[in-house]
Amino acid sequence: ERQLPAHFLRIELMVALIGGSLPAVLFLANAYTPGAFRFLLYGMVLVVGTLVGLEIPLVMRILKRNVALKDLVSQVLTFDYLGALAVSLAFPLLLVPHLGLIRTGVFFGLLNVAVAAWAVLLFRAELRAWRAHALACAAVFGVLLLAMLGADRLTTWAEDRFYGDRVVLRESSPYQRVVVTAGPAGVRLFLNGNLQFHSRDEYRYHEALVHPAMAAHGAPKQVLVLGGG
């Protein structure tokens, strides 16, 4: 029973390290080992989900010392649901558009490290080796901080490898990741990694849109183009 805080700390740090590095690892895996991407994705999600699932029973067992059992379950699950709601809204609307996928993952990892550090201070008297736990928090924090600082470089490496051709433009808008490549085969436009335009065969797409309208009108002198990007 006295080791419950230590178990909670270990799980929290594993969630921070694995969950925080998950987007970066998947970015690199998709670029360098695409055949193993699905297995790595499902495996890491399964591990993180299992660890997060273990946290709630541990928190309940720790809090039952000070909270009545009739109120404990409702309070823990309420905060769990509220936290999940806040994250599900902040992730697509605020964090990813401003931080990007890699930095967003690292940000949540840093939040887990902060929770672990707070737990070290809170349960310091019950931990057999609180200094070792504090050192582990510092080590995980350092790894995630390096990932945060190197996020742009990791993204560049992964995209250069994934697209093959030279990347001439890469931008993240509030809605999508825009990448333009140029190579011997022509210019390509990708939105969120999906091919949208290729200079080699774009005429097929545009001719199908333009010719029927032009033929129906005859000989237009003024043309209004809507959404012609």
Language model: regions and residue ranges:
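Alpha-helical transmembrane segments of multi-pass membrane proteins
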Residues: 1-229
